[in-house]
Amino acid sequence: MVLDNLGSSLRGSLDKLRGKSRLDEDDVQEIVKEIQRSLLSADVDVSLVMDLSDSIKTRALEEEPPGGTSARDHVLKIVYEELVDLIGESTEIPLESQTIMLAGLQGSGKTTTSAKMAWWFSKKGLRPAVIQTDTFRPGAYDQAKQMCERAEVDFYGDPDCDDPVQIAREGLEATEDADVHIVDTAGRHALEDDLIDEIEEIEGVVQPDLNLLVLDAAIGQGAKEQAQQFDESIGIGGVVITKLDGTAKGGGALTAVNETDSSIAFLGMGETVQDIERFEPNGFISRLLGMGDLKQLSERVERAMSETQAEDEDWDPEEMMKGNFTLKDMQKQMEAMDKMGPLDQVLDMIPGFGGGIKDQLPDDAMDVTKDRMRSFEVIMDSMTEEELENPRKVGASRVRRIAQGSGQDEETIQELLEQHRMMEQTIKQFQNMGDGDMQRMMKKLQNQGGGGGGGMGGLGGMGPF
């Protein structure tokens, strides 16, 4: 994920404080320099870096850590609070009728973002419509139409019209029954006068309640000038940062937020319409520092399980917590995991895992895990309903038959059965837990997250990895 290098670098800087109970000025100076290097290498604006590091240095030297708090955890808390303050609050997005206009350069991800946002609003119970006004880029209409079909939301565009202002006007009329209108505008390879003139004309017609600037996370220092010009032209009320699943540094996009005195509204991190989330500064910085984000994790789990259950109404996820945990349940869990997004993003949300442990994994660990899950899915697709419902009936002869039918080796099938047994045992432990036990476990997870290292906190065996 983008900013992973920044997060890893910051965590590495803080880990140098392990074992220290108190800090002297040399310790603080060294850690501040490390933080400065981390932020500057991620393309965060120099003036922002200096202001942030000055605040961290002052607080680290002047504030007394609470009793029992290590020097590392004290500085971690300060860095967390200062980064949250730097990014600011999330853009307010009311769940009511409104018109939102997207602006940005060509290739920033506006068209994809418009469909993703429409999908997000639809999941909140509103009826959104995307109005595609980009007549400059070949294929813009087709791309927008296809993505809106995948998102199952209303769409308006006119491939035969070359007047974006007319399309915007007619689009509002054609989609008047929609609650939320999302107007996608054209971009250019650079900020040209005709782009600014066009977007100002469209704004005059649609009268948006909110203008969002869409920025590619890879934009770097160029984000500052781009943000300034769009803000002067139409006024930017919020920013959407896209392509967060890439390897870009991301600091330039964060700089643009500060430059426009706005805030971040959404984060885009994949190619499907579901790969979008509302920006929550506390959770975002928490993930960055390896502390997890249980709120976002629970939202993704709830959505994924709900969608999986809707596809198979005979399957009830609550039943597996009451009775036998079958391979069918495991299969459905894996389908739900696929819907939660890239595995590395999900792991970032688990306190104590996203930082310390994930940093130590081999570079290909995520790919290996995904390949293993794919193999498990192929194996289960080759099983009979009886075998899925009663894994204990899968003996040696059945293993050989399943291996032939799935094209997988017998060892991988045995791994699947062993993984199922581990998950079954873990679920039985949950069945025997009272509310107090569950609360203590979650508190333990949070504490491990605060330390940035920790382990899986008992979650090993809860999934096929």
Swiss-Prot record:
Composed of three domains: the N-terminal N domain, which is responsible for interactions with the ribosome, the central G domain, which binds GTP, and the C-terminal M domain, which binds the RNA and the signal sequence of the RNC. GO terms for biological process: SRP-dependent cotranslational protein targeting to membrane. SUPFAM superfamilies: Domain of the SRP/SRP receptor G-proteins (SSF47364), P-loop containing nucleoside triphosphate hydrolases (SSF52540), Signal peptide-binding domain (SSF47446). Keywords: Cytoplasm, GTP-binding, Hydrolase, Nucleotide-binding, Ribonucleoprotein, RNA-binding, Signal recognition particle. It comes from Haloferax volcanii (strain ATCC 29605 / DSM 3757 / JCM 8879 / NBRC 14742 / NCIMB 2012 / VKM B-1768 / DS2). It catalyses: GTP + H2O = GDP + phosphate + H(+). Its EC number is 3.6.5.4. One of its GO terms (cellular component) is signal recognition particle. GTP binds at residues 104-111, 184-188, 242-245. This is Signal recognition particle 54 kDa protein. Part of the signal recognition particle protein translocation system, which is composed of SRP and FtsY. Archaeal SRP consists of a 7S RNA molecule of 300 nucleotides and two protein subunits: SRP54 and SRP19. Belongs to the GTP-binding SRP family. SRP54 subfamily. The keyword ATP-binding does not apply. Involved in targeting and insertion of nascent membrane proteins into the cytoplasmic membrane. Binds to the hydrophobic signal sequence of the ribosome-nascent chain (RNC) as it emerges from the ribosomes. The SRP-RNC complex is then targeted to the cytoplasmic membrane where it interacts with the SRP receptor FtsY. It is an enzyme of class 3 (hydrolase). GO terms for molecular function: 7S RNA binding; ATP hydrolysis activity; GTP binding; GTPase activity. Gene3D superfamilies: P-loop containing nucleotide triphosphate hydrolases, Signal recognition particle SRP54, nucleotide-binding domain, Signal recognition particle, SRP54 subunit, M-domain.
